[in-house]
């Protein structure tokens, strides 16, 4: 198996995607604990409703914008959202609604960043190359998930 630029691009891309998910996952879990089990069902229903709306918007965007631009647009949208959540968390520390909306947002983010990645990755390879390389790409994603979770552990632990 030879290493080509599509494999490097997709492997690196998926590493970063899953890294970001696993860095944010403990914060989502903390928010879920803050929400409590009595309200969690409501917020899961809210996730489904937001996903229905977001998928409709995404379908409309995909029909109007080139594939290379849609990836930049979607990821740019989510990066902007992250900065806004950092600002909201700074301005409104310990806000129930900032945390609860982050919980919904994270679940939508989780779905979209992985789906958009695979939609892009499928177009990087022909059928034969996909059979050869998708396992490696998945392994790169798994490595990103592990490094992301370990980064949080190291950052939050008291040991040097």
Question: Which residue ranges define each predicted feature?
Answer:
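Helix-loop boundary and gating motifs at the non-cytosolic
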Residues: 2-50
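Hydrophobic alpha-helical segments of secondary membrane carriers
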Residues: 13, 74, 136-140
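Hydrophobic core of transmembrane alpha-helices in multi-pass small-molecule transporters
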Residues: 15, 94-113
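Transmembrane alpha-helix termini and helix-breaking/packing motifs in multi-pass membrane transporters
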Residues: 35, 52-65, 86-91, 119, ...
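Glycine-rich segments within core transmembrane alpha-helices of 12-TM secondary carriers
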Residues: 41-53, 131-152
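C-terminal ends and interior cores of transmembrane alpha-helices
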Residues: 76-95
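Intracellular juxtamembrane helix-capping segments at the cytosolic ends
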Residues: 109-126
